[in-house]
Amino acid sequence: MIGATSFLNHSGPRPPRYRTPSPPRRAVEPISPFTTTTDFRASWIDRGDSQAASYDRDRVTSNNDVYSSTNRGSHGRTSHGRSSSTIDTLATIALATSPTFAPLSYRPPSQDPTPAMPLFPSQSIESTERPAKRPRSEKSPSPLHQPQTTVAPDANPSSTFDSMKTDAELLLNFARPSNFQPAAFYPSKRVSIDESYHPHYGEEPKSHFRAGLGSTYILPDGEKSAYHTSANTAFPASRMRSQSDGSAFISRPVIQGVRPNTSSSTLPPIVWQEEEGNAKTGPGPPSTKFPGAETRYENSVFTGIDTGADRASLDVPPRGDDDTESDENNQANCAACNLVRIPVDSEEQGDVTWISCDGCKQWFHIVCAGFKNDREIRTVDKFICRRCRPIHGQTTFVRKSSRARTAIDYAGLNQGLVKAASDSLEHHYIEPIREGKIRFLPDNFPRMRPELVTAEYFERGSGMTEPIVIPAHLNTRDSIPIVDPEFDSLVQEATSQEMFDELLEHLPEEGKDFETVIDCGQDQLDMVVPQGLTVRAVAELYGPEERVEVIDVKSQQGEDKRWNMQKWADYYESTGSKVVRNVISLEVSQSKLGKLIRRPKIVRDLDLQDAVWPEELKAIGDYPKVQFYCLMSVADCYTDFHIDFGGSSVYYHILKGKKTFFFIPPKDKHLKKYEDWCNSPAQDSTFLGDQTKECYRVDLSEGDTMLIPSGWIHAVWTPTNSLVIGGNFLTRLNYGMQIKVAKIEKDTKVPRKFRYPFFQRIQWYTALKYLEDDPIPQSVLNAFAEDENYRFHRAYPIYYEFGERENKAPAGDPYHNSRFYSQAELEGLPDLAKYLLRTALIASGYMVEGVTMDARNAVKRSIPKGQGDPIDTVRKFGIWVAWKRGNEKAPQWTRPGVVESNAKLSLTEKKPAGRPSRRSERNAEGQRMYAERQAVQRPLEQPPDLTNGLSSEESSSAPSTVEIPQSTVISTLPGTETKELKEEIAQKPRSIHRSSGLGPKRVACDACRKRRIRCRHKDEHNDTISAKQTTFGTFPAGVQSSLAHDAASALNSLAAIASEAGFQDAANGHGLERLEGSGNYSTAILSTPNAATSKVHDGSPEGLNTGKKGRSKACDDCRKSKRRCIHDEYGRIDPIKAQERSKPRATASAKRPRPPQEEDAAFTLNKRPKQESTSPVARPASLFRAEGDMSHTQRPVDLEASSYFGTAHDHNGIAQTKLTSAVGQTSYASPPAFQSDTVVMEVAGQGVSKPTASLVSPPTSQADETDVPPEQDAEKDNHVVYYTPTTSSRHSSRQPRHVDRYVPESQPAKAVKTTHTPSKRRASCSGPTTARRVTPGAQGSSKKPASRPSSSHAKKGVSPVTEKKFDRMTTTSTSPGHKGAKRERTAIADDEPDAESLRLIRELQEQEFGLRKRTTRV
């Protein structure tokens, strides 16, 4: 798309608004197809002079002397008088021209190039007339210069009269088309020629009439305008445009494929002849006015009618190659509106913007193409009109990158406000500042005499709140005369020592007010700076080869090249054009130059660092070195707006040259804008003073000294080469501002090297200095400790205690003050206390949100050692602040134990130092509000060996801590029912521990977080701690209900591991005897509907790694190497786990999660199931004998006596060991056999196993979550316990199903077979299911919880009460035959079921429970 090209020139200056087309210069505009010059001339001869009078509308002289006869003669036209434009005249002419009207019926485009007979053929159109549209180049010709095609006359004259009648009625405003909507918004009778036109955004061609005016041609049916370009014409791909024809866009109504109404009933009548005052001189048409707008000019426009409704392409009859006729006619038309423009002899180009279709090469007005203005066209890459879109596609636009770009202020560049990068070697603000283009407020800062600038002046006043200038003429180095000349002459005349001593004794009184000091060239500020110091001297004193940091002023960045003082001195002294560089950070306190400089006395008195830094550290040079800076700047150096590091105050003495400061006061709104400006990508091109609207200019010259208070934002310009000595210092007067600026530096990520060194340590030394110099009396300390609302009474603030109110209380008195405390100092003490509290919390191990481990370590190093606990120190300092301020309570956090137990302080487990996750660091900014709510987190130490479990008191002592799961262990004796059996334990939210305090609390496991997927393992995290609790004792009922869901999840996993891996000892079945003696393996099955036991202990055969988060039950090394983990939660080798034999591993394909549909073909029984249960529930169910009858002969077991402390009988071993095998794994089976959703028992004596127990009920049943009980009779009593959580893992579909194995005939009675189905398939079951199928015997019923819908399980002969009692027996009963479970498992491990059996089992289960397949996450 090419740039805009103007095709028409108007006479006179271009109006500021859109131009309207020029009005018609004749009573009636001809209505006929467009023809060539030859056809016009021929038809003119045929018609005679009678029509010529009508055609001569272009040069009218009557009633308008704008058009002269010379112009008419130039065109060879006969001069005619203009009609009076009455209705009668219009009707007469309309009827007279009716024989040549074209019929209203449209016909398809004619391919015959013969020209049509024109209504008013042109008498002559000279070739010398300028084209209306000037071609931009030969390769991009104008639409006007295309070969034109003539249209054959209509051969059907039958409709001539109808056409005449219709057009006459339309012309005379007697009729209107029914499908034309009136333009109701025209308020005036005066309207421009184009007012009937409105852009048609669909780009359908339309015909428009001009309310009986203008040069309008009407094409016959189906014919195109003569200037519709064909697709075969040599149009370039680019489009030529000029400025937009705004008048057309303003007023033309949208017409959807219909002929427009030209009736004057819808358009206001046009006044033909304007007043004489409106006529414009020159070769232009009479003007018309648009309502409310000034007079506009535009050329007359030809408009053709094009049906276009049933046309599919833009093909037009081929045109000749003769360019002469095109040049003579100089006409162009829009393919959408057929608007044809006839040129006038004008020197100015028109205001019409055109755009070319890249498909058909047709030209359109931008308003016809659907664009409002030129700005919209700039975004177009390839324009495709409506008819070409089915072929060429939609219009494409220039791609706009979403990458953030620095905005360039082109307006500012044009005005010279911002210099381009290559224009000058200086900073782009220098010239606007120098020329006064940037306006500043005049400063009203005080100019003070040096003797008034003292620490006492500021401390006893309101502090140092604004910059202070000590002019050079007031700060002289002359000594102050203390005696009069007469006394001095007497001293000179003294001839003996006695006479001299007598004169000293009678020294005048006025001299006693002065202090005699050594004259070392100090000024009245007691500042010593070597006179005559130069940059070369600085280089020699500092060291010619010493490194110096040089700033490139234009980029405000440090120079990459290495500079030394010798090179810098050479640069500074060089002349001519050079890159502007600056040195502003040369600290010289440790050099020879530093020993020649002394700061002003007020700076030394106010310097907080000098007052609190230990003297022993000063003696060895270990202190922050910010006292002396030497600033060397060449002319036109500029330092953009900044705040001195740490909010420090500044003293500034000009040795040579000049400096200009631009100050912005440190108001909160300005500090916020400053922070935003620092973080803005447009910082370099944005002048902060313009943003704040409050910027003061201060000019300093040689010898001037200035003190800049804390927090003042300032920029510095160097008009001439300058040499400055300055320094930074913290004060007691600005605690709040200094801490605020330090926070801004952190928020804006200022590099540490550009911050105040040891800032936090200075604050701590300050607090320690307060407590040491002015300790709190014990009585005051006790009063604050006894009453949290205690206020130390003071009659007036202590900053009033000077002069006649000076405090003279002795040391130890509650009202004693070791020194004077200023008002500004007392007001900043609470901010200092809060700042120290935060650092103390961080250093003491509290998990403060938004703090990385590196920051934590830095804070620890910043706190002075040997001062006791930082928390205790800051508590004491908080009380000290309340005591000194008086009449206020001590902060709440000073109360004993509040830091640990306050609800606003969230405590968490302390993690070892490690690199924080990148995601946490990225979220630090976004979690600032979260950090305020969760202020700190206290680590809760977990010893490796828990002997007594976690008491409920320990858990409740930290209300904001991460909830530690409590197991609910219920000793279920036969015939007893407990309330816990019916409890619904609500799951509590919990976070997974991290190595960093940044970001929100994690609730995702490691695996999901690394894969960046939604974690559904949230309930598995707390299984670790509750495992220990289950092992070592029974907890109170309140503790039992904390996280029972996690317990069920652990039990599920336990059974799954036991079922899939098994214990691979020898067939004698004594493999587990060595584990029973330890008492580690206890049965802890919950009888509550929504709760089950959590993990048991670390000594489970599976080797749990309870220190890991989420579902990762093994340590990282073992999990990655795919081997059995033998490590405990602390990474140490667990001897019990190490003694366990390796479990059989499945094939590699089984290790991979597979979709449910892929599990039809292959199942692997040994794959470790992964727990991801959101609300697991464990419930014991019924036991069945192989024959189907119930067995109630199990022995009740006391969990506290036998299970927990290792006194269990031998028949406890297998079941309890399997329970602890894999805490947190999703499974529903327990030793001694495989168990899951489908439980199949072998019938004794049969060689082929057949299902003896039912398929496990869907997860809506909570009563099915049972375990395999011990066997009463090793030969006969083979029982199966169903274990099904109510809500199971979402991802367990990736786990293989464990099905029943075939048992050899040698062990028919001990072969208890189960199949394991992952919980994910069962989790989706909510509808009713069929009854359990038990072959051949009876089955146990499922007790459904109150919170779940009925599972519709059949209960054959078993009442809920009996089942409940039996469930409790099965979970705790043992038998001697239990020891042989490992032999059974070893025997059956060799017999793998075939794939067909597995598939049938799974299909039966899905049919029964209505399970749906879930796709696995990849």
UniProtKB/Swiss-Prot annotation:
EC code: 1.14.11.27
ZnF locations on chain (PHD-type): 331-391
Cofactor: Fe(2+)
Stored CDD domains: GAL4, PHD_TCF19_like
Coiled coil: none
Record key words, sorted: Chromatin regulator, Dioxygenase, Iron, Metal-binding, Nucleus, Oxidoreductase, Transcription, Transcription regulation, Zinc, Zinc-finger
A single GO molecular function term of this UniProt record: transcription coregulator activity
Record Pfam families: JHD, JmjC, PHD
Composition skew (Polar residues), residue ranges: 61-71, 143-162, 1250-1263
Cofactor note: Binds 1 Fe(2+) ion per subunit.
Composition bias, Basic and acidic residues: 44-60, 127-139, 308-321, 907-925, 1130-1143, 1186-1195
Main location: nucleus
Region (Disordered): 1-86, 102-162, 308-329, 891-964, 1090-1118, 1130-1195, 1250-1394
Disulfide partners: none
Domain JmjC span(s) in chain numbering: 588-746
GO biological process: chromatin remodeling; regulation of transcription by RNA polymerase II
Binding site for Fe cation: 642, 644, 714
GO cellular component, one term: nucleus
Biological role stated in the UniProt entry: Histone demethylase that specifically demethylates 'Lys-36' of histone H3, thereby playing a central role in histone code.
Homology family: Belongs to the JHDM1 histone demethylase family.
Designated name of the protein: JmjC domain-containing histone demethylation protein 1
Gene: jhd1
